[in-house]
């Protein structure tokens, strides 16, 4: 940056006199060392320094009186990990002194009584003169060696306290009172009970019923509710608290599973295969589709193409089938909107006199079949529109070519009981150019329900 003439350039970074608040650090507490911090429980600690010995003594004493570690942690405001580690080390070694972090656990080879004897022997006899004492006892008792040992012992006592030997060597306390008040050498002589694994609690039916009723009222009972419930169910308050914690976890798991099942029902592809009923395949002729050769083309099995069409459960209509299993077979054609129309091989005549039948179609049928079809012209009409069918391509016309399709409910026709296998047909109107089903305003065909009709045998036609 360019500055004006005579202006003093300013530094972009702040000077040393500017103090900015530090973020991301714990709250500092005014301690003699100025390094105190506060843990989550509100206790003051110094990072990197071991816990003071008087707090360690208090932890061991409270554990000796049967107080749980979690309660000790809250009362002394010491983290639970620190409490458990001190107690575990005291149970293993009998010592509360801070040790090195990590490494293998010290093995308890000697008892605290033996360790005390060893410490007393070390205080009475320095390390450098142990070998000479052993030699004097078991070897030749030279007076010179004894005098040298005494001189070394006197010199060691006169050493300064600030020397390395004076710091590392443990000094003997002056009196028992000072031993009790010592924060370094004293070890609590309190036996701790080994933590035994508690057997799994078994609840009776009455206890479970009482707990479930309380869980229906509230998922998070307070201390008064838990104590009252523990008295009624003859349990401890701690067992009631643990039961509610486990019950809430099980309730959350069940709620998540129910939501997943409800979501799967909303997805069409999530239906199980058992919910999709198996339907027979329909047969559609691929040959030239002349009006007079419709029965022969459909009845010829050599020129047919099988197209299986699965149906969703919502569009399948169960119907009562006739007693003769050979009298009918359902054949369905798909549409673009999951609608399905029946496709059969005989024609149904118009229901009124104003709807004449195509002469070419009528000439291809026998008088007996025509008589049977004209006798059932008074069946009530059930209008149902669906996509049109193109027999040449085997597909569907666009939605504009909508035609009245046959419904899919089966009704047993009394006049066709004598026929072993019969199949009826709802005729579409065929144009001369496309041979497709097109809507014609003058034609209205009677509907016989919502299932397929009986096919007529080829030998009758």
UniProtKB/Swiss-Prot annotation:
Domain of life: Eukaryota
Record flagged with keyword Transcription regulation: yes
Single GO MF descriptor: DNA-binding transcription factor activity, RNA polymerase II-specific
Biased composition (Low complexity): 319-329
Ranges of Acidic residues composition bias in the record: 177-188
Gene Ontology CC: one annotated term: nucleus
Chain residues forming the annotated DNA-binding region: 34-171, 196-255
One GO BP annotation of this record: Wnt signaling pathway
Residue ranges, annotated region (Disordered): 1-21, 141-205, 290-330
Matching InterPro entries: HD, Homeobox_CS, Homeodomain-like_sf, PAIRED_DNA-bd_dom, Paired_dom, Pax7_C, PAX_fam, WH-like_DNA-bd_sf
Gene3D superfamilies in the cross-refs: Homeodomain-like (1.10.10.60), Winged helix-like DNA-binding domain superfamily/Winged helix DNA-binding domain (1.10.10.10)
Region (RED subdomain): 113-171
Coiled coil: none
Keywords: Developmental protein, Differentiation, DNA-binding, Homeobox, Neurogenesis, Nucleus, Paired box, Transcription, Transcription regulation, Wnt signaling pathway
Locations listed in the record: Nucleus
UniProt feature, compositional bias: Polar residues: 290-306
UniProt biased composition (Basic and acidic residues): 148-172
Region (PAI subdomain): 37-93
Chief location category: nucleus
Stated role: Probable transcription factor. Promotes both hatching gland and neural crest cell fates, two of the cell populations that arise from the neural plate border. Acts downstream of msx1 to induce the neural crest, cooperating with zic1 and mediating signals from both the wnt and fgf8 signaling pathways. Induction of hatching gland cell fate is independent of zic1.
Family, per entry: Belongs to the paired homeobox family.
Name the record gives this protein: Paired box protein Pax-3
